[in-house]
Each structure stands twice: as C-alpha cells, then as structure tokens.
Curated annotation (Swiss-Prot):
UniProt keyword annotation of Repressor present: no
Family affiliation: Belongs to the gastrin/cholecystokinin family. Magainin subfamily.
GO biological process, one term: defense response
Role summary: Antimicrobial peptide.
Protein name: Peptide PGLa-BM2
Domain of life: Eukaryota
Residue numbers of Alanine amide PTMs: 21
Length: 21
C-alpha cells in the first residue's frame, strides 16, 4: 500500500544519505 511504498522510498533515501555521509 501507500505506507509500504513510502517506507521503501525513505529506506532508499536513507541508504543514499548513508552512502554520501
């Protein structure tokens, strides 16, 4: 659903942020 989609997007952004940190 929408919540799981948002969770996937947030997880992806978090991964990118960690990679950039």
């Amino acid at each position: 659903g929408m919540a799981s989609k948002a969770g996937q997007v947030l997880g992806k952004l978090a991964k990118v942020a960690i990679g950039a940190a």
